[in-house]
Amino acid sequence: MTPAELKRLYHIIKVQLEYGLDELLPDHQLTKAPLLMRKSLFWIKNQHPEKPLGERLRLALQELGPVWIKFGQMMSTRRDLFPPHIADPLALLQDQVAPFDGELAKQQMEKALGGPLENWFTEFDIKPLASASIAQVHTARLKDTNQEVVLKVIRPDIRPVIDSDLKLMHRMARIVAGAMPEARRLKPVEVVREYEKTLLDELDLRREAANAIQLRRNFEGSEELYVPEVFPDFSNETVMVSERIYGIQVSDIEGLEANGTNMKLLAERGVSVFFTQVFRDSFFHADMHPGNVFVKPEHPENPMWIGLDCGIVGTLNSEDKRYLAENFLAFFNRDYRRVAELHVDSGWVPADTNVDEFEFAIRIVCEPIFAKPLCEISFGHVLLNLFNTARRFNMEVQPQLVLLQKTLLYVEGLGRQLYPQLDLWETAKPFLEEWMMNQVGPQALVNSIKDRAPFWAEKLPELPELLYDSLKQGKAMNQRMDLLYQGYRQSKRQQATGKFLFGVGATLVVCSAILVDNAYEQLSMASGIAGVTFWLLSWRAYRQ
């Protein structure tokens, strides 16, 4: 490690000890190295003993800076790995840091766009509208259309900082996994690797721009979700230009109520938007925390969600969607046997899983949940309990399902914050049942034919020629198979002949040796010559 890395590592350990995070390392499971290191830093004491562990962890990550803040935010979504007293405080982490100089931001943008901003924009505000750990946002107007826009720019020199801290994270994860057998269950190395991929993806604004364009296209003309327009001509790896929006933050309940918003409809539309993204589009916004969701102030009786920051999205394939929908329906019908079978059929758990034991484990965990009224049941926590139970049966982490679970918890939390009586199951069940009918019912056949009609219309004129070519190739294939079979039979005959000749030759050579011992020299010589001759004939048969 370089001196700079050692200095940073010492600072990280010092902050962790000042917040008493060594409580996370139980003494009876530690190897000698971590114990020795802790004792060697005896002068660093817990400065916040009155605060609970989860809050101390949150404050420590906040102090360590943006890379660790985002890591904590990701940890808060992994409720399959971390208990509520750890995950809940981490969900409160705020990704807010001091802005960097606006003139420097302008220089970064001009470098990325290849010219002065005045060529394309007017009224550029040197004061940032918002600032986060990865990027900063400024406002301006498009010169050609006078439309208000926001320019998002990646912080300069952020990449070396991220690379350095990620390298330390990987080292620390390997140390923790090696020092504590119990920690291996949390898969620290895999968690850091997953975080690294997510964080590095956020450094490329082309990805976010493409995601926003796709999501906007999916909801074009919708009354439920609005995604601001992105201007790809002015967007690249480090700069993204998009439409400026004015809205009420979804967590501003007083502001929404003062605007006369239909809170029940707004909450139900949040659920509808989620299930539409997942089951209709297989492409969903996976970072829908309150900071990224606004509500249009116009037409409060017919409220519309606004989705920002599409840096993290999730996708599901058709098989995952079908299994997920069937799981939800089976769960709320309390058909735990079907839930267990679906997990095996989907490959989420090993094929040799004992279905009876798996069913019983699911029943024990989930039956108490359904003792409550349906309107009080958390859809997200049902999914969380299911995944936690499945992990005991060696279910591998499914990244797409982790993102789905996180998003569902966000949407459900927002929905019940807006309208506490929200019955998510009542809202979602008709959607799921209709989707299942469209997938496996008569309508599915109609949809399949409709989707494939252009392909068959294009191929229909070619069918006679394709049929003729197929018959012709089939005949040629039969002829080749006959020739191969004849060659195979000939080869087997030659091998049999070779084995026979070799056996005769071996017998004659043995006889020659016996005759020499009994003083029949002439017969011995004749027998030996004959044996060698048969061996040569055998070798020739094999060669052919």
From Swiss-Prot:
Lineage: Bacteria, Pseudomonadati, Pseudomonadota, Gammaproteobacteria, Vibrionales
Organism superkingdom: Bacteria
E.C. number: 2.7.-.-
Entry GO MF terms: ATP binding; protein kinase activity
GO BP terms: regulation of ubiquinone biosynthetic process; ubiquinone biosynthetic process
Entry keyword Transmembrane helix: yes
Positions annotated as active site in the UniProt record: D287
Protein name according to UniProt: Probable protein kinase UbiB
Family, per entry: Belongs to the ABC1 family. UbiB subfamily.
Chain ranges passing through the membrane: 496-516, 519-539
UniProt cross-references to HAMAP family, sorted A to Z: UbiB
